[in-house]
């Protein structure tokens, strides 16, 4: 073969190779376009791209709120991956809410996400049953009307010790975190287990202490690599204390559970079933064929009371009380409403009366908007692949959530969102403009504005869950205990507003103690002190 023939052959081959390469690139690009989108290439939000991720994980604690806000506005219609203190979460845009809101536990699980968030391997969190949430939804919430008098009765008893009588012009100094933990612990104990343990000091201390130690354990262990946690956790005093609380719960509850089961099996004619959460839990377990060991039920009761009842309600009450002191102009309109809805006095309050307190309800919602339990909500672990409406596939095992805090502060959805407007969620003009009666008289409501806070038909309650109000979650697995928590919160706060003057310790010039932000969580200042003075008047 001559040199010219070889040259011509190479030229033809070169042209073919170039053509094949062009076709190959086109096909690869076409396949990428046709393939379902994945989450592998979503943008990542971290404190600094110049720092190693173990440093970014530690910096998540003080800077998470600002990072979530920045990610939300930078990638508003896109998913982004956030480096957290112990891993990563995928923060989703609002356009995926409808895709996910109705999915059940087999597809996306709030229980598994909670277990992961709370480091369940080291904190005694259980996720083996939905009986707790089922009992709340099917038994507790429908029973609220008959439970309110019991809660009030217990609060009356508790107030005499935690809020003693004062002489005229005398102020007493109290830590509000301790005050509300005590009030909620005593009142909820009666609802949860009746007379058996409601005044048991060991139980009250254990339920409060467990939540405190859980928080410490999470903060310490999360930045530590997962393979080192089994070596570190056993040496933490907080894990020792949690283990003691679990052992105590089993020692106190197991005999009660066993005795109730024995009485039910023997059909003892002299036995009357208690009307409390523990009994409803046992009965529902029988109905659904899910008979749990007594020790396991004891642990569930500890987790329920410590985390779902006492801790969350205490945080809400602290924030709301701080907000009231910071904005005293709201006190008189609230007192007027409480007097109107409780004409026979607070001690004879009913569920219907507390539901009618729309101003207080709105104030609590606004307080929660400024200081939600967490700036991320709808935490779910994907249990099996989920395909979203635009073809994006969420693979099994990823942790997803929505930027609830940033959404609630978005001017697209809330008018003038950076201003605290305690009555913005009221519908009736006389309540909405209680601070400006001249506006209420003229009923100046802008019907053309479709933002949530001014839309006349928009859901507005403290416990209302919407696409822009996710303080209690969203969708099928929304917090079922929010109705009981809200009712207890309003019961306690209405008593304080009616019966007491309160202020920050340190005099008239004292300012609202700054919140404590730990990662996505926004806590009130737990060391702050308030001064209380009993009003010397009858109501």
Positions of predicted regions on the chain:
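N-terminal membrane-proximal hinge/A-helix region immediately C-terminal to the signal-anchor transmembrane segment
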Residues: 2-132, 150, 468
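C-terminal helix/juxtamembrane-tail motif
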Residues: 1-12, 519-539
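Hydrophobic, well-ordered secondary-structure elements that form the walls
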Residues: 367, 397, 420, 475, ...
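Conserved cytochrome P450 K-helix E-x-x-R motif and the immediately C-terminal K′/meander segment
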Residues: 62-69, 344-392, 398-411, 459-462
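Cytochrome P450 heme-thiolate monooxygenase catalytic core
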Residues: 149-315
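Classical protein tyrosine phosphatase
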Residues: 313-336
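Conserved cytochrome P450 K-helix/beta-meander segment immediately N-terminal to the heme-binding cysteine loop
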Residues: 402-459
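Cytochrome P450 heme-binding "Cys pocket" and the immediately downstream C-terminal segment
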Residues: 330, 452, 464-465, 476, ...
């Amino acid at each position: 073969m001559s040199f010219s023939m070889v040259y011509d052959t190479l030229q033809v081959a070169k042209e073919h190779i170039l053509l094949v390469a062009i076709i190959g690139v086109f096909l690869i690009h076409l396949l990428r376009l046709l393939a379902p989108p994945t989450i592998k290439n979503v943008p990542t939000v971290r404190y600094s791209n110049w720092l190693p991720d173990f440093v970014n994980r530690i910096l998540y604690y003080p800077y998470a709120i600002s990072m979530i806000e920045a990610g939300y506005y930078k990638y508003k219609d896109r998913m982004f991956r956030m480096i957290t203190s112990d891993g990563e979460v995928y923060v989703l845009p609002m356009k995926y809410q409808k895709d996910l809101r109705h999915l059940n536990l087999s597809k996306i699980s709030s229980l598994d996400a909670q277990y992961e968030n709370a480091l369940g391997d080291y904190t005694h969190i259980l996720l083996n049953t939905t009986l707790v949430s089922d009992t709340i939804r099917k038994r507790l919430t429908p029973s609220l009307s008959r439970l309110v008098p019991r809660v009030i009765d217990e609060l009356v008893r508790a107030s005499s010790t935690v809020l003693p009588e004062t002489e005229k012009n005398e102020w007493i100094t109290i830590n509000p975190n301790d005050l509300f933990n005590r009030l909620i612990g005593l009142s909820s104990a009666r609802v949860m287990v009746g007379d058996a343990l409601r005044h048991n000091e060991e139980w009250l201390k254990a339920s409060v202490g467990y939540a405190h130690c859980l928080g410490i354990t999470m903060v310490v262990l999360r930045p530590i690599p997962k393979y080192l946690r089994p070596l570190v956790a056993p040496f933490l005093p907080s894990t020792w204390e949690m283990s003691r609380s679990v052992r105590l719960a089993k020692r106190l509850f197991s005999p009660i559970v066993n005795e109730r089961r024995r009485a039910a099996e023997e059909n003892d004619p002299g036995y009357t079933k208690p009307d409390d959460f523990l009994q409803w839990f046992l009965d529902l377990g029988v109905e659904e064929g899910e008979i749990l060991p007594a020790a396991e039920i004891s642990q569930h009761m500890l987790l329920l009371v410590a985390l779902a009842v006492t801790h969350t309600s205490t945080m809400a009450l602290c924030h709301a009380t701080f907000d009231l002191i910071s904005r005293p102009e709201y006190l008189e309109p609230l007192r007027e409403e409480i007097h109107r809805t409780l004409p026979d006095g607070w001690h004879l309050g009913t569920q219907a009366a507390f539901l009618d307190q729309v101003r207080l309800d709105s104030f609590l919602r606004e307080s929660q908007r400024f200081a939600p339990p967490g700036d991320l909500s709808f935490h779910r672990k994907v249990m099996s692949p989920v395909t979203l409406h635009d073809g994006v596939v969420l693979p099994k095992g990823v942790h997803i959530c929505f930027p609830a805090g940033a959404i609630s502060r978005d001017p697209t959805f809330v008018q003038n969102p950076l201003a605290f407007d305690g009555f913005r969620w009221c519908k009736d003009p006389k309540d909405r403009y209680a601070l400006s009666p001249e506006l209420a008289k003229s009923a100046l409501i802008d019907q053309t504005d479709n933002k949530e806070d001014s839309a006349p038909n928009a859901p507005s309650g403290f416990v209302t869950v919407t696409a822009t109000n996710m303080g209690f979650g969203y969708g099928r697995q929304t917090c079922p205990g929010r109705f009981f928590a809200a009712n207890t919160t309003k019961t306690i706060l209405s008593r304080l507003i009616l019966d007491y003057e309160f202020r920050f310790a340190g005099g008239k010039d004292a300012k609202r103690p700054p919140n404590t932000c730990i990662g996505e969580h926004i806590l009130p200042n737990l060391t702050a002190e308030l001064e209380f003075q009993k009003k010397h008047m009858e109501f």
